[in-house]
Amino acid sequence: MNRVLSKGPKGLNGLLRACPSNSGRSFLYHSTYNVSSRTFWSASRLRSEDSPSGSQPLKPDPNDGIGNNTSSASSQHTPWYLQEEALIEEPRQISSRDQIPELPENSPAILPVLLDYIFKDLGLDELRSIDLRGLETPPPIGANSIMIIGTARSVKHLNVSADRLCRWLRSTYKLTPYADGLLGRNELKIKLRRKARRARVASRAGTTVDEKDDGITTGWICVNAGVVENSPVGEQASRKVEGFGNIVGGTRVVVQMFTEEKRAEVDLEGLWLATIERDRRQKQVSIDTKSDAPHEEVRAPTPVQNSSSDHVFGPHCRSSTILPLEQRRGLHSKCRLLGPETEHNQEDGLDDGLDDGLDMSPDSISTPTDQLAANRTCDKEVDTDSLLEHLSGLPDEQVLSELGAGQEDRDSTPFLRRFYDALSQMSTEEAAVARVKLLCTAISRHHQGYSKESLWKAFMTCNYHTYPISDELGFEIVSALLTALPPHQKGPKATGVLPEADRELALRVLEHLSLRGTDVLNMKVFHLLYEAASHPTSFSGEEVIKDVTDATKDRPTSRVAKMIESLDIQFDPEDARKLMMSMFRNGDYDGFWNLWHKLPLYGSPRTSADYEMLFRLHADLRDECRARDCVSTWVPMMSREHPPIPLRGQVVQDIMHCLLIGEPAIDRMARAGSTSNLVLIWNDCKNIALGRGRRGSVERMNVV
């Protein structure tokens, strides 16, 4: 050892410096010899008398390297294992999985809160928001929608997230969301437990379990939050609607939740982004088409004097390029304002056209349709809407005569000639919609030459080509399909027979209307369904209904009434009054009185027409007990209505008719001097009918 290490501090110091350190630092060596750093002086040091002895420390010589290094090392040294390394801040890379997508323009107020909840609380990754509000054709999930797409980590996380989202929307925003593909909490646990049990049994038996479709690993849940904002969307520059229906007020929010594998398989983002891009290109092509040079006039140009009125006729533009099978026409249904220099020429041309196209002889102007065409001197062609409106006001016999032999007949009557002449001047989509209206009118009037199958095909043609069909026209189609067959088609006993096939067609039309955003859960639709349920489906079904009890007889209509009560449909006074009459005529008196009492509660006070309907229905029923109760209860209530209903007019005749049904000998009782309530009402009605005025007996009954 003595041979290896030299004596003294130099040998040990050299050995320690030669050994490498694990931490990359050299060990600090302190000498074993205590070397004093005090400086020796040959002379005694002069000290101040004021300062105490030893109060001033000794200052080392700056040239003394040993003293300087020792003091700095002892005061600043910290062991390496206690030293804190400085944190090097590196720029954090934030992936798309950890980001909340940007909000679309004019988004509802709930959207940022919903995205934050989905991202932070539910823990869905790779969120993506797609704005579908600008699509011309609304998606199947509903018009005016915003779609949110997220990825769950597992099937269990997927179901739990969807369940929590539905509960949060119900409790926080009072919405009614529904989730397609969601399993309940207990149902998911039970299915997972059964799946694990089958896997254990299969592993013991040495077989495998086929898990292609176990009802759990669908990997896709669609949570539709419904309309989250009732305010209508911004008005567009053009009010013309193409595709399914009109603009729907309010914004819908739909959350699509996937597992990672299912999201890559479905590629929902690619589908809708391609649809949005295609829609954008179509709009751009339409804008470019409208911005092209004006079309060349086919006829000789006629100078037009500008009118001083505020009605401005805009220029009609035509594309310079002709697409395959493209046909565009500019239509005018109003009389153009012409200048003085062209008025005479235009009148001559109009007279020539009337002489060529319309027969204005006295023999030809014999029907109301001819008179309508003769009165329209501003247009060479009669508008189809005006023709159909005029046709709807005619009696049934005249309507059947004007419609000719059937839908193949186009020139047997003046109405058909003018209607199809007007169709030839219209665009393809307008002509298709006009044919649908004509079929609805013909079927509703029981014309045998127009079938419901042809109406269904015409509706599907408009649906296929995305022609605009208004909600009113859609309900007219449903009403026409639910029109009962006339008696002479099934024999005299088969009054009001509605086959099952016609009901199925009407329900399919309602399904198509609901898919394009039409609200089909309203009083009007349920009144149509109630009327349809009151008709038998066949001749044999009608005979069975007559032999069963009243409870069985009203069973189809009672189901519709229960649906109206359970769905809490918005109350519509006009449709409610129609439904009341249908309920009374079908024997559903409880439903009738329920709606009767609801009228003033929903801000629709009862009127004189309502009381006329009430007493007329009871008189037609010819039930003595119900007639007496109706008169004794509701005649005094007429003066308590707001505003009061006067006892005059047709309601007096209906009350007297109802009194004769309830008390056939009431006139003899009145002459005998009876003072019963019914006799007092009879006397008042009789005096008013004879022009003597009201004596106030009913008012005295109210006081009593």
Curated annotation (Swiss-Prot):
Regions crossing the membrane: none
GO annotation, cellular component aspect: mitochondrial inner membrane; mitochondrion
Keywords: Membrane, Mitochondrion, Mitochondrion inner membrane, Transit peptide
Subcellular location per the Swiss-Prot or TrEMBL entry: Mitochondrion inner membrane
Organelle transit peptide: 1-47
Protein family membership: Belongs to the ATP25 family.
Protein name: ATPase synthesis protein 25, mitochondrial
Gene name linked to the record: atp25
